[in-house]
Amino acid sequence: MNKSDGNESFALDSLPENIRYPFGKRELEILEKQLDRIVLIYQVDTTYHSALKDIKDQKIISLLVEPSFYGRHHPTSILVVATCNGTYIFDIKALGLIFLELAKILEADQPRKVIHYSHRIADHLLHRQRISLGGIFDTFVAVCLSSNTRIPYTLPEAISLVFGLPMEKVTGGCESQRNFTARPLTHSQMRYLAKLVQLQHIMHDHLNYSHIFCAEVYRISLEFSHSYYGLRSCDVAINMAPASSFGFQLLDSFCKKADKELEQI
């Protein structure tokens, strides 16, 4: 998420040591190499089908949708997918919609999808693309359970906290990067999206403590992603304010159990 979504910055309090993984020089160099492998897809051609093949071959992918902060209330502009081989930016505005083959991948249990704020993204995909997102690992849920907090950190804020990176380095500090509905997309916008989705992927790797914890996050993420299901659009709008904690109550019932599991790891 980003400031174009209207989200105000929350105090970036220190996270517990067990979920802080400061980025070093080597990690930043690897990230820079990953940012050289960005593929923009705006039509159904060989590049599109090659991207789908790579995505289907993965066990885990990282996913962004822009704009999605207000769920169903904005049309889909961009879908970004990161694999171990690179980043694919699907220009949904140019394509017209998310076509069936890609939709089936998003709905399937495999590959697993690493996303942030699954309740907002799932609501968006359901109402804008008629896609019921499956196989979800929500990094927001993972951070909440790991740190025993309920602060609505955006993806850039969570990345900044977990990896010890200044917010300016995560966001780039350029307002034009946050307008993903205008065309053409700039080179800096594409690098910004690729950086977020790749760092989200890496964050999953670090927050994936054990099979037990991972399974719990998957289970809670799926339930959390359904937070807005069945609500009228007017009710959803009220509960999608930037500081909204709607749906967070689902995390509370699992908190004590998750804490006990973490103590045993």
UniProtKB/Swiss-Prot annotation:
For the keyword RNA-binding, the answer is yes
One example of a Gene Ontology biological process annotation: piRNA processing
Q: Which InterPro entries match?
A: piRNA_biogenesis_EXD1, RNaseH-like_sf, RNaseH_sf
GO annotation, cellular component aspect:
P granule; PET complex
Keyword list (alphabetical) reads:
RNA-binding
Question: Which SUPFAM superfamilies does this entry report, sorted A to Z?
Answer: Ribonuclease H-like
Using the record's annotation, list all stretches that form the 3'-5' exonuclease domain.
32-82
The answer, when asked if RNA-binding is one of the entry's keywords, is: yes
According to the UniProt entry, its GO molecular function terms are: protein homodimerization activity; RNA binding
Q: Disrupted gene: resulting phenotype?
A: No visible phenotype. Flies display normal fertility and do not show any transposon activation in the germline.
- Family indicated by similarity: Belongs to the EXD1 family.
Record text about domains:
The 3'-5' exonuclease domain lacks the conserved Asp-Glu-Asp-Asp (DEDD) residues that coordinates divalent ions essential for exonuclease activity.
Known role: RNA-binding protein. Inactive exonuclease.
- Please describe the quaternary structure of this protein: Homodimer.
- Name this polypeptide is given: Protein Exd1 homolog
Native species of this protein? Drosophila melanogaster (Fruit fly)
